[in-house]
Design a protein with these regions (language model features):
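The canonical Cys-X-X-Cys-His
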Residues: 40, 46-56, 97, 132, ...
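N-terminal secretory signal peptides that target proteins for export/translocation
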Residues: 1-6
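Extended surface/linker regions that mediate inter-domain or inter-protein docking
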Residues: 128-188, 203, 271, 281-290
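Bacterial N-terminal signal peptides
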Residues: 8-19
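C-terminal capping alpha-helices of c-type cytochrome domains
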Residues: 93-107, 120-145, 242-262, 272-300
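Detector for the c-type heme attachment site
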Residues: 52-58, 102-103, 137-138, 200-206, ...
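Gly/Gly-Pro-rich "capping" loops immediately C-terminal to redox-active cysteine motifs
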Residues: 37-38, 43, 56-94, 112-126, ...
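Electrostatic cytochrome c docking/interface patches
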Residues: 23-45, 163-192, 239, 309-313
C-alpha cells in the first residue's frame, strides 16, 4: 500500500471511530437534548454559524458577533445572534427569523447585505428553519452591541439593496430533482442550502452577485483576504481527480488525498461544523459535488492577498 492509500485508510478508520462518538458542542454552545433541538444543532453545524458569529481571535463569547469579514465593499461585522433581547435576537419572533433567512429582511423591514448568505439560506426547508430557530433560542444570551460595518461610500445605502435583490435574488425552498437519487438530492440540499458552499467558492461580479456560470469554481477575492479553491470536478484546476470516498474523508478529517491537510478557513469550517455531520451526509455531499459541471478556473490558494475595495474576479 502506498503512502496516500495508507493515509486514507487510517483516516477512514479514524472517521468510523469519531462518527460513533457523541457529538461535542462547538465552542461554548449548549448541546441539544430534544429532537427538534438536535435537528437545529445539526443544521447549526452544517451552516457554520459558530465560526461566522463568534469573534474567536478576540476570545469573544459564542455567537455574540463581532467577527470581521473583509470584502471588496469594505468590512462587515457579524451580528450577535444570541437570545439577548437588547443586542441579540431575543426580541425576535420565529417568523422574524424565518423571514430573515428566507427573504433577507430584518424585523424592521430593512434589507440585509448579501454578506449574510440569505441568498442560499432561502432554500432551507420550513421545518429546518424552525429547528434552527429553536436551537439558537436555547443558547446562552450574551449582551454585546453589534459593531457598525465599515463600508465604501457606494455601499453604505441600504436603499439600493431592494434593486439588487430584484436583479440577483430568487427566494424559495430547495426542490428535489426527481431524475436524481435521494443521496444526490440530499447532497445538493446540504451544499446549495444548509452549508452554503457556493457563497465562498463562487466568484462574484462587481455588483457582489454570484457568477452563475462559474459556480464553485473558486475565487481570488474570498473572505478574510483568502483565495478560495475551485471545487468543481475539473481535472486540471479543480478536484476532478479526487474520489468520492477521499472527498468525504477530507470533509470529516481535513486530510486531503495527497496527504496534505486543510488549513485556514476551511480547517475552521471542518472543525466547527462538517466533521460533525453523519457519514451518509458526507457521502451525499461528495456525490453531489463530483457531479457538478467542471469549470476550468485556476486559483493559487497557497497565496494570500489583501482584498481591496472595488476589486473583484
Amino acid at each position: 500500500m502506498n503512502r496516500v492509500g495508507a493515509l486514507q485508510l487510517g483516516a477512514l478508520l479514524w472517521l468510523s471511530v469519531v462518527a460513533a462518538s457523541p457529538v461535542q458542542a462547538a465552542g461554548n454552545t449548549a448541546p441539544a437534548v430534544d429532537p427538534q433541538l438536535a435537528r437545529g444543532e445539526y443544521l447549526f453545524r452544517a451552516g457554520g454559524c459558530y465560526g461566522c458569529h463568534t469573534d474567536v481571535e478576540a476570545r469573544g463569547r459564542a455567537l455574540a458577533g463581532g467577527r470581521a469579514l473583509d470584502t471588496p465593499f469594505g468590512r462587515f461585522y457579524a451580528p450577535n445572534i444570541t437570545p439577548d433581547a437588547e443586542t441579540g435576537i431575543g426580541a425576535w419572533r420565529e417568523q422574524d427569523f424565518v423571514r430573515a433567512l428566507r427573504e433577507g429582511v430584518d424585523p424592521r423591514g430593512e434589507h440585509y447585505y448579501p454578506a449574510f448568505p440569505y441568498t442560499t439560506y432561502t432554500r432551507l426547508a420550513d421545518d429546518d428553519l424552525r429547528a434552527l430557530w429553536a436551537y439558537l433560542r436555547a443558547q446562552p444570551a450574551v449582551q454585546q452591541p453589534n459593531r457598525t460595518h465599515q463600508l465604501a461610500w457606494y455601499a453604505r445605502s441600504r436603499s439600493l439593496l431592494r434593486l439588487w435583490k430584484e436583479l440577483y435574488f430568487t427566494p424559495g425552498v430547495y426542490r428535489p430533482d426527481p431524475s436524481q437519487s435521494a443521496a444526490w438530492n440530499r447532497g445538493a440540499y446540504l451544499v446549495e442550502a444548509a452549508a452554503h458552499c457556493g457563497e465562498c467558492h463562487t466568484p462574484r461580479s462587481w455588483t457582489g452577485a454570484l457568477d452563475g456560470e462559474r459556480r464553485h469554481a473558486g475565487t481570488r477575492t474570498g473572505p478574510e483576504d483568502t483565495m478560495v479553491p475551485n471545487v468543481t470536478p475539473d481535472r486540471g484546476t479543480g478536484i476532478g481527480r479526487w474520489r468520492a470516498s477521499g472527498l468525504a474523508i477530507y470533509l470529516q478529517s481535513g486530510l486531503r488525498p495527497d496527504g496534505d491537510s486543510a488549513s485556514g478557513l476551511m480547517a475552521e469550517v471542518i472543525d466547527n461544523g462538517l466533521r460533525h455531520l453523519r457519514p451518509d451526509d458526507l457521502a451525499a455531499i461528495a456525490e453531489y459535488v463530483l457531479s457538478m459541471p467542471p469549470v476550468n478556473n485556476p486559483v493559487r490558494t497557497a497565496d494570500r492577498k489583501p482584498v481591496k475595495k472595488g476589486e473583484f474576479d
